[in-house]
Structure formats: C-alpha cells, structure tokens
Amino acid sequence: MSLEAEVPELGQDDSQRELTIKEEYQLWRKNCRYMYEFVSETALTWPSLTIQWLPENKTNEAEGLIDAKLLLGTHTSGEDTNYLKLASTQIPLSNSSNTEEKSNKKVTSRIKITKKFENNFEINRARYMPQDPSIVSTINGAGEIDLYNLGGDQKTAIAHFTPHEDNGYGLSWSPHKKGYLLTASDDKTVVLTDTSRLDATDLSQVCKFTTHKDIVNDAKWHQFDESLFGSVSDDKYFYLFDIRTPGEPVSKFYHPESEGINSLSFSPFSQYLVATGNANSNISLLDTRKLSTKSAVSDGLLHTMMGHSDSITSLEFSPHKDGMLASGSQDRRLILWDLFKVGEEQAQEDAEDGCPELFMMHAGHTGAVTDLSWCPYKDWTIGSVADDNIVHLWEIGKTLLNAEKGIELKDTDLE
C-alpha cells in the first residue's frame, strides 16, 4: 500500500470545522489498510478540477505494476499560467492473493507530469476522444474549447473555438460518432460541434440547444443511442434531446426539491437508466421511458439516494460492473452505490450506517471533490481530485469486496 501524502497544513484557526476535517482525515488514514488494495496521494502545486484515466497502459508482470496515464488540469486563480497536464504513474496489478506479500511490496504511485499544454483560463474539464485518445478537448472558465494532440510536439492547442459566452463544465465526446463534441455552459446553452470537420481555421457548429433557462451544468451522450444526449441545469430540469430533431427536448424531468441539478451519468449497461446529481445532495435514478413531455412534471423517478451532505459535483457509472455508481460531492466525500441493493431490508444497526445501496464511502479528501474517473482497464480502481490540491488514486480492497460476496452467499443460502 502506498500512502505518499504531502498534506497541506490546515492552519492555526481552531474552528470546530477545521478540527473535524483534520480528525476525520487522520481516522481515514488509520483505516486505509482495511478498505483498499492500494491508495496513493499526490499533492499538486495548483488544484485540478478535472481528472481522467487514459486508456493507454502497459503491464509489467515481473514487477507486478501497470504503467498508467492521466489527464489533469490547473486552476491558478489567475496567479500563474494554466495548463492541461499529461501525467504518468504506476499502479499495482494486485493479483496476489497473499495479503502479507501485497502489503509489504512498495508501490510508487506518485504522479509525474510528463507534458503540459497552455490554456487561457482554468481548465474545468478535460476529456479524450474515445475513437482517438491522443486528441483531448478542454472547456475552461471562459467557456472556450481547445483541442490538443497529446502525441504531437505542439505545446498549444491544435484548435481553439468559442461557442459559449461564459464559464462551462459540460464536456462529452460521442462514443458513437467520431468528432462529435457536446459542451455546456453558464450561458444556458448546449452546443454540438463536429470537430472532424476541422481545417486550419474553422470548426463546424452543428447546432445550439437553448431550451434551458439557467446555467447548464452538464451534458452527456447516451451510451446506446447515437442520437440522444442529456443535459442538466440550475433550472431544475433534466432534458433528453435528439440531435435529429434539434429544438425542444423529446422528454424531461423536473426536480422541484433541489436548487438545481449539477451532473448526470447514463448507465453503460441499462439503456433506460440515467442518474442525476443534485444541488440538494441527493442522487435521482430516472427511467427515460417514463419521462414526461410536459413542464414541471417529475414522472420517471425510480429512486432517490441519500448519503451526501452537500451538493453533488460529479457522477459516473462503473464501466465494469452493472449497477455500480460513483458520486463526488462538496462534502469532501466520494460514495460508491450498488443499485442492486436498493430496497433491501436492513438490520437497525446497519441502517444507522446508511441506506442499503451505499456500498462504500471514500473519506480521504480534505476539500470538496471536483471530479472522479473510473479506470477503464482495471476493475474497482478510481482517480479523484479535490480543491485541497490532492490527487487520490485508489482501488477498493478485496477484503471489502469479499465481505460483500459473503453476505450475498449467506442470503442465498437462507432462501
């Protein structure tokens, strides 16, 4: 296990909140060995608002390591140049069933920055193109979109365009159609751009969606239908759009209890399931078949999950395990949810720890979680970043996973 933290000092303010954060962090470190196969912490000079594992990796069987790459950004608050950063690290294979051997082997998971690409403002999100991972898009604090070639020598963007008039966080490459890029912004719009029609000076904007009445916080492509995408906004709406009929959404969901909806994720396993992360700290599970075409209607809500204590910032379904969802929040927590446990009966002592679908809580960050990413080639492995300048890379422990399997077997036996 690697715990290579450079934890920033909390300062001399004796407020109850800071003392609580410090004590919680120390307790988390103490219990890491019981929860993780490995966990590493790396301090950055500036916080990163974005993280994503790149699919490129190299396995070293002899050393029991995987050479991995990550995308990070910077948020310098105007005090320094902002960059898209390409980072390298090593993570363990964790194939050994010998716990003592695993715990005694040193793993150097310190993140190293191997390339930097300049950007005009803080990078809110950076994502690689699925069909060509060497091409990366970013959206920044001015709503500007930049494309970079990770494999080239150019240290600046290969394309720069300004479809928005304000800060933006929504950024999603189509998994179906090469070059199709969705962006969403505080200017209340979602824009679809065809980056494959790039020449030296021009990008082709396919269409702009202007239905939302407030800040659009996120937009994501559907995992099964190449024509569908979803968007969420401070106007409390989730909209499902069809790019073949631009204009009004084909269906919608209204969330009256929340101050807004911050993020969404479509399931890669169930074509009708979408999760939304809300400003009121809850997560909504929706059935897209049951959504309404009318305004101010909440049809389609399957279940509400409660476990966070502050606004949801990021949401992503596992690419490996059906029904496993990760959420990050302003409350400094990252929660893994097992949707197959929704509605299970609980003993009273278990219910006090949370709802049955709350699978695990990662409590190692000392600042608001800004983004998370499932590793695409290694089960149960996640990268997460927070505004405390710390990057966490971690894999859920086999002990925890086996304990869950044991419970399932016991229930089966009882039936």
Swiss-Prot record:
Localization (cell): Cytoplasm; Nucleus
Cellular compartments per GO CC: cytoplasm; nucleus
Intervals holding WD repeats: 118-158, 163-203, 211-251, 256-296, 307-347, 364-404
Swiss-Prot/TrEMBL keywords: Chromatin regulator, Cytoplasm, Nucleus, Repeat, WD repeat
Site annotation Important for interaction with HAT1: residues: L273
Annotated InterPro entries: Histone-bd_RBBP4-like_N, WD40/YVTN_repeat-like_dom_sf, WD40_repeat_CS, WD40_repeat_dom_sf, WD40_rpt, WD_repeat_RBAP46/RBAP48/MSI1
GO biological process terms held by the UniProt record: chromatin organization
Pfam name, any one: WD40
Record region (Interaction with the histone H4 N-terminus): 349-353
SUPFAM superfamilies: WD40 repeat-like (SSF50978)
Organism domain of life: Eukaryota
PROSITE patterns: WD_REPEATS_1, WD_REPEATS_2, WD_REPEATS_REGION
Role summary: Regulatory subunit of the histone acetylase B (HAT-B) complex. The complex acetylates 'Lys-12' of histone H4 which is required for telomeric silencing.
Subunit structure: Component of the HAT-B complex composed of at least HAT1 and HAT2. The HAT-B complex binds to histone H4 tail.
Family in the record: Belongs to the WD repeat RBAP46/RBAP48/MSI1 family.
Name of the featured protein: Histone acetyltransferase type B subunit 2
Originating species: Debaryomyces hansenii (strain ATCC 36239 / CBS 767 / BCRC 21394 / JCM 1990 / NBRC 0083 / IGC 2968) (Yeast)
Gene from which the chain derives: HAT2
